[in-house]
Curated annotation (Swiss-Prot):
Keyword Ion transport found: no
Family statement: Belongs to the PsaA/PsaB family.
Pfam families per UniProt: PsaA_PsaB
Annotated residues for binding of [4Fe-4S] cluster: 559, 568
Annotated organism of origin: Zygnema circumcarinatum (Green alga)
Record's keyword terms, sorted: 4Fe-4S, Chlorophyll, Chloroplast, Chromophore, Electron transport, Iron, Iron-sulfur, Magnesium, Membrane, Metal-binding, Oxidoreductase, Photosynthesis, Photosystem I, Plastid, Thylakoid, Transmembrane, Transmembrane helix, Transport
Membrane topology according to the record: Multi-pass membrane protein
Quaternary structure, from the entry: The PsaA/B heterodimer binds the P700 chlorophyll special pair and subsequent electron acceptors. PSI consists of a core antenna complex that captures photons, and an electron transfer chain that converts photonic excitation into a charge separation. The eukaryotic PSI reaction center is composed of at least 11 subunits.
PROSITE patterns reported in the protein's UniProt record: PHOTOSYSTEM_I_PSAAB (PS00419)
Reactions mediated catalytically: reduced [plastocyanin] + hnu + oxidized [2Fe-2S]-[ferredoxin] = oxidized [plastocyanin] + reduced [2Fe-2S]-[ferredoxin]
Name by which UniProt lists this protein: Photosystem I P700 chlorophyll a apoprotein A2
Transmembrane segment boundaries: 46-69, 135-158, 175-199, 273-291, 330-353, 369-395, 417-439, 517-535, 575-596, 643-665, 707-727
Binding site for chlorophyll a B1: 654
Length: 734
């Protein structure tokens, strides 16, 4: 008999219903639950899959480079980055009539194309690429790297090349290699690329495979390095009149600390970026020699953790027992990694616009908006994932004996206090913020706007002033002419920084007022509520007063049967599921805020945000409704335009989003009846009844239907906002 899907679970493979297919897909990556899995095979499978992931990433980035080189306008864009629209790739669509062909033929192309809003043009230009040949070379190189990654993944599944479990659990060696090798050496290599290729290219000197070994990046070569006169590398920086990519106004410095932005490109100075990466490299290469491995020198992580016992004994055993708990739990490690990655991704969103690293990115408003929104959504999904795997850790891997009275055990002991404090913070933020918004709404509706309650964010303004923003008139730290901090930095980074922070033409420390105060607290409400749901889900994953034996039921269960009331919807999976809605809701507010504030700044109309953002009707009318007009006009009586595709995506996104509710609100019985009715009709219809299922059709389980509903809700929500964001921004700024 041929083996049926899924091969990894004989129990499921023998299921006579369509449940076999859905549960098979749902558990395909839950290696721990598969038949005949051993700890060794588990680690090896995950290790090999990492190479597969890398292969996919390199293939994808190779495709980006290839399509821009083949169908884009990279060389034309490089000659005039502010006026030529960058092309991502051509569009071939047999449905296009003449109006569509004309609408989508842009950027100097001969046929319909997509415009790139990803920032790759700015990135490739900044790092020294200038020709299509450069792009093709990069695409080919990444294709080769992708192939190597695939072979490596296959190789590490072969008997001779399978690493042992002890190798995977050698935490000190892994940390040393990742710190020194992954972060340290790659940062050093990137510094090398910036100094040897990107900086000379930014000064109009072409560096290629033919001359990079013979062209020193600094007139004095390595002499200052070996003679200890490192400051020579910072002398003669590019002038403020430097034209990027040309010799005009170019200097010779390679490692600087200028602060602020290049006046023409509005991006960070390349020589500052190189200096930053060099510092990071030194730091991480040193850090990668910290932990004790073969030579008996350096720190032992186990000893460090075991020594972390709070004094006076009032706070338990501190970090004792954590080494084995973390080292033996893949879910704990994944939770930590996801939490870190989530924070970093959100930081990328924040820094991409406030300190733009790529030349001319600051002038490409749609790309800035797209990059901010993209990174914030990714961060949200990654962070919720951290808590999901934290909850799975508590269910599958946590050992109370190993963790007696340490920090993990005490978290569980104090969970009521933790959860109730979070709940109190969420309630306080929610009622007060909504109360202020609604009060202001009513005052506007009654024609007495002067009766609004408007609170200046004085603490935030004070912090901005401390960093040198002089607008608010606080006489503090870098806003105080007599401050020692001010005089100490005058010779290096401060003048550039102070120019930038007090310039009205960038997004560094935006001017804030009562509208910002309110939306900040709305976002704080969203963050605290999301965290409340996630933390409660993880801390109650093993059991609660209502259901002390919860961990016996696993991560996701719908209920414990009809005979035990109150056990529905309380699995750790359900907490994750609910938290994702709150996460999406919160990031909605974050991106609305960012986008509207920037639209008004870019249009030179900051007063609109300041005046309309203090009441809900202002957000609905002056942000959402006003900026959706381009989308609504994508199709009109006069034909179509280049925003039509976004208008269609806006509608399609709403459709997908609404479909989610069909799964979220109607449950198994409804679907089971519907399916049985359809099957009955099918079996009694001539011709149709010649086709039979092997599996008996059954409705999705409650948990699965929720997942399908959540997936549609999330995808529809993001599609809708992406279309709105790109159309409303590109419609205004071209």
């Amino acid at each position: 008999m041929a083996s049926r899907f899924p091969k990894f679970s004989q129990g499921l493979a023998q299921d006579p219903t369509t449940r076999r297919i859905w549960f098979g897909i749902a558990t395909a990556h839950d290696f721990e639950s598969h038949d005949d899995i051993t700890e060794e095979r588990l680690y090896q499978k995950i290790f090999a899959s990492h190479f597969g992931q890398l292969a996919v990433i390199f293939l994808w980035t190779s495709g980006n480079l290839f399509h821009v080189a083949w169908q884009g306008n990279f060389e034309a864009w490089g000659k005039d980055p502010l006026h030529v629209r960058p092309i991502a790739h051509a569009i071939w669509d047999p449905h296009f009539g003449q109006p569509a062909v004309e609408a989508f033929t842009r950027g100097g192309a001969s046929g319909p194309v997509n415009i790139a809003y990803s920032g790759v043009y700015q990135w490739w230009y900044t790092i020294g690429m200038r020709t299509n040949q450069d792009l093709y070379t990069g695409a080919l190189f990444l294709l080769a790297v992708s192939a190597v990654a695939l072979v490596a993944g296959w190789l590490h599944l072969q008997p001779k090349w399978k690493p042992s479990v002890s190798w995977f659990k050698n935490a000190e060696s892994r940390l040393n290699h990742h710190l020194s090798g992954l972060f340290g050496v790659s940062s050093l290599a990137w510094t090398g690329h910036l100094v040897h290729v990107a900086i000379p290219e930014s000064r109009g000197q072409h560096i290629g495979w033919d001359n990079f070994l013979t062209t020193p990046p600094h007139p004095q070569g390595l002499t200052p390095f070996f003679s200890g006169q490192w400051s020579v590398y910072a002398q003669d920086a590019d002038s403020s009149g430097h034209l990027f990519g040309t010799t005009e106004g170019a200097g010779t410095a390679i490692l600087t600390f200028l602060g602020g932005f290049h006046p023409q490109t509005q991006s960070l100075w390349l020589t500052d970026i190189a200096h930053h990466h060099l510092a990071i490299a030194v730091l991480f290469i040193v850090a990668g020699h910290m932990y004790r491995t073969n030579f008996g020198i350096g720190h032992s992580i186990r000893e460090i953790l075991d020594a972390h016992v709070p004094p006076a004994g009032r706070l338990g055993r501190g970090h004792q027992g954590l080494y084995d708990t973390i080292n033996n739990s893949l879910h704990f490690q994944l939770g930590l990694a996801l939490a870190s990655l989530g924070v970093i991704t959100s930081l990328v969103a924040q820094h991409m616009y406030s300190l733009p690293p790529y030349a001319f990115l600051a002038q490409d408003f749609t790309t800035q908006a797209a990059l901010y929104t993209h990174h914030q959504y990714i961060a949200g999904f990654i962070m919720t994932g951290a808590f999901a795997h934290g909850a799975i850790f508590f269910i599958r891997d946590y050992n109370p004996e190993q963790n007696k009275s340490n920090v993990l055990a005490r978290m569980l002991e104090h969970k009521e206090a933790i959860i109730s404090h979070l709940s109190w913070a969420s309630l306080f933020l929610g009622f007060h913020t909504l109360g202020l918004y609604v009060h202001n709404d009513v005052m506007l509706a009654f024609g007495t706007p002067e009766k609004q309650i408007l609170i200046e964010p004085v603490f935030a303004q004070w912090i901005q002033s401390a960093h040198g923003k002089s607008l608010y008139g606080f006489d503090v730290l870098l806003s105080n002419a007599a401050s020692p901090a001010l005089s100490a930095g005058q010779s290096i980074w401060l003048p550039g920084w102070l120019d930038a922070i007090n310039s009205g033409s960038n997004s560094l420390f935006l001017t804030i007022g009562p509208g910002d105060f309110l939306v900040h607290h709305a976002i704080a409400l969203g963050l605290h509520t999301t965290t409340l749901i996630l933390v409660k889900g993880a801390l109650d994953a093993r059991g609660s007063k209502l259901m002390p034996d919860k961990k016996e039921f696993g991560f996701s269960f719908p209920c414990d049967g009809p005979g035990r009331g109150g056990t529905c919807d309380i699995s750790a999976w359900d907490a994750f599921y609910l938290a994702v809605f709150w996460m999406l809701n919160t990031i909605g507010w974050v991106t609305f805020y960012w986008h509207w504030k920037h639209l008004t700044l870019w249009q030179g109309n900051a007063a609109q945000f300041a005046e309309s953002s203090t009441y809900l009707m202002g957000w609905l009318r002056d942000y959402l409704w006003l900026n959706s007009s381009q989308l609504i006009n994508g199709y009109n009586p006069f034909g179509m335009n280049s925003l039509s595709v976004w208008a269609w995506m806006f509608l399609f996104g709403h459709l997908v989003w609404a479909t989610g509710f069909m799964f979220l609100i109607s449950w198994r019985g409804y679907w089971q009846e519907l399916i049985e009715t359809l099957a009955w009709a099918h079996e009694r219809t001539p011709l149709a009844n010649l086709v039979r299922w092997k599996d008996k059709p059954v409705a999705l389980s409650i948990v699965q239907a929720r997942l399908v509903g959540l997936a549609h809700f999330s995808v529809g929500y993001i599609f809708t906002y992406a279309a709105f964001l790109i159309a409303s921004t590109s419609g205004k700024f071209g």
